Amino acid sequence: MKKIYTFGGEQVERNITVGDIITNKQNNIKMTQVTAATQEESEIVSSQNIDMIITGSDWYPDVRKGAPNTFITAALFAGRFITNEEILRGAFDAVMGGADSVLTPRSYEVVEMLANEGIQVQGHVGMVPSMSTKYGLSLIHI
């Protein structure tokens, strides 16, 4: 375990840090990440030595209770956080509450906005169901 300070200044222990993730990526070391939405799920995940958990920002407090030392990313749901101000507020709420990073499915500019505030942020590359109405099929969002 590594002793770190959260964005909000609380000293905690974490299984990995962003620095570890970068080093592992550079050295082609695979890591594991799963989704958890409840305290019970995160307790199970934590007991299995999964490297990282991803959860919705609304579920983060319960998930953290079940995995106090696991690196957790709080996803900012696109339909809940619409404006840049709402996205920024949601991200700050998550990291001030102890989340290790946030994920957003928004634009590169939004990712950059969060990074410029010192928030560890992941973009999202994946299926975009909302685009299937426009194009008649599911698309990969890059």
Each language-model region and where it sits:
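Generic hydrophobic/aromatic pocket-lining and core-packing "Φ" positions
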Residues: Q39-S42, Y60, N84-I87, A91, ...
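Alpha-helix-loop-beta-strand connector modules within alpha/beta enzyme cores
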Residues: W59-R80, V110-S130
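Acidic/polar active-site rim loop that often engages polyanionic ligands
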Residues: M131-S138
